[in-house]
Amino acid sequence: EEGDSIASEFDSMIAKIMAYGRTRQEAVSRLRRALRQTVVVVRDGATNKSFVESLLADPIFESGTYDFGWVDGLTKAGGYGESPYADVAIVAAAIAAYEEEMLIDRGRFKDSANRGRPIVDAGIGKVIGLRYRGSGYEPRTRKVASGRYRVEVDGVTIDATIEDSGQLVQRITVGGKTRRLLSLIESGTHLVEIDGVPHRIGHDEGGVIRAPSPSVVVGIPVAEGDRVERGDRLAGIEAMERESHVAAPFAGTVREIVARENTQVGTGAPLIILEPEGDTIDADVGSVVFDGIATSNAAALARCEVQLERIASLLLGYDVDPVAITGSMGEIASRCTEELSPARLQEIESRIFEIFVDIVSLFRRVPTEDDVGDVTRRSSQEYLYSYLKDPTTTDALPERFTEHLERTLAHYGVDDESSEEHRDAALYRIATSHERMTGQIGIILTLLDRRLHDPGTSDEGFRDVLGAMIHQTRDRYPAVHDLAREVSYAVFDEPFLSEVRAEAYREADRQLQLLEQHLDEPTRLSLI
């Protein structure tokens, strides 16, 4: 059952799956389906589920021409050494490592908030070294929106989407295909299953050779100082009543032997530290190629709505480069004018303005005239810091501030039913956006300038957004404040004043026409 411990002294059966059918082919098909739909996770352990699935897919098994020595022969020959979906697995591991680092960052953020001054890492993305079958990878991972990531590795850019679909199980979409993902980090190693195929991916730790599963070290045929070639045997291990060996993933010199013979080791336990020769650690001929899942639809990515969504993600504190966005604002403006109707373009821009206003409203450093009902006369930033120290004390905060906070959190899908983890992640992104705000002001100015020169027709909602922007940026972002006033005048005030003026002129013309029609003295004097 879930939560049970499996003793390391002997091999314990987790489950036995038996399939029946009217024919051998039907029984095998049912067994394959049962294994494919079964999720087994052993913390600090491993199962032979994938190995059994590989056996069932082997043509020799399908034809029934195997003998009793077939499995042993495969193991000795290193059969099934190549695992499909390794490219997807490395991307998934990079994303999991990114989220682990973000969890640490959010912990630091909360600790600093408890001390009265929250601090965030305003850097964009994370670079975390990974190692898979002897090859090192340094993917740069960025979270570009909720559930969406961009991974750059070996000169290839990959867009990935991850959705939760059950306990421990997720779905990952890369290269236009969606696959089942199971990801678990244990003992410094990522266990990643893609459509049931397991991969163990470690952090690049400079030549540390680790145990692939719980096992007994039955032999170490090398000594410290020995030089080994790629593929040479470094250690013999026994697991699941089967003996195998750990091979050198690259040529090098044995720097240190960590494990000892006849001892039990867990998954990921260090066995040997191998010093690579020169750059051989990165020159593995078996390196994974990522071209098959690379993002290729450049035209779709350049679409106006996609670019505007990137701007929204930037303002929400996700890992979007403001310099790249700022440099392409002219192209975005011209493309949007061609691709979108004025109403749709204004709708998206208004949402971007709302995000900007809601975030800056939480960081005002001085009280305003709107805080007249607040006897303490504290700023919104002080209230935010109080909330970050203890999110359960919302009752002690002014209603106006909590309304601002709830409206801002709603941009991240956070409401009263959201988990603490979801809320913490949103608060971290809010603080990150504010930390980067100086680099984002130019984008807001460009969008406002477009509305100034193409005011079009706008509803009262946009009037409210502009009013809030004018109020919240006063004495803080003077360029935004002044331009927002100009836009408000151009979109709402000037058309109104022009209509009033035109109506006055029309009335004057009407009165003059009446005077011309009544030239006799008594009527003329009464009209005047």
Segments and roles (model prediction):
Residues E1-R148, T263-D493, L497-S498, A502-R510, ...:
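Catalytic cores of soluble metabolic enzymes centered on carboxylation/carboxyl-transfer
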Residues D4-S5, I194-G219, R233-A251:
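Short beta-strand-turn/beta-hairpin segments enriched in glycine/proline and small hydrophobics
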Residues W70-D72, R179-E205, I273-E277:
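Short, structured interface segments
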Residues S165-R179:
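Interdomain regulatory linker/hinge segments that flank or connect interaction modules
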Residues R210-R227, F250, E256-T263:
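Short histidine-centered loop motifs in beta-beta connectors
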Residues D226-A247, V265-T280:
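Short hydrophobic beta/alpha edge segments that flank linear recognition/processing sites
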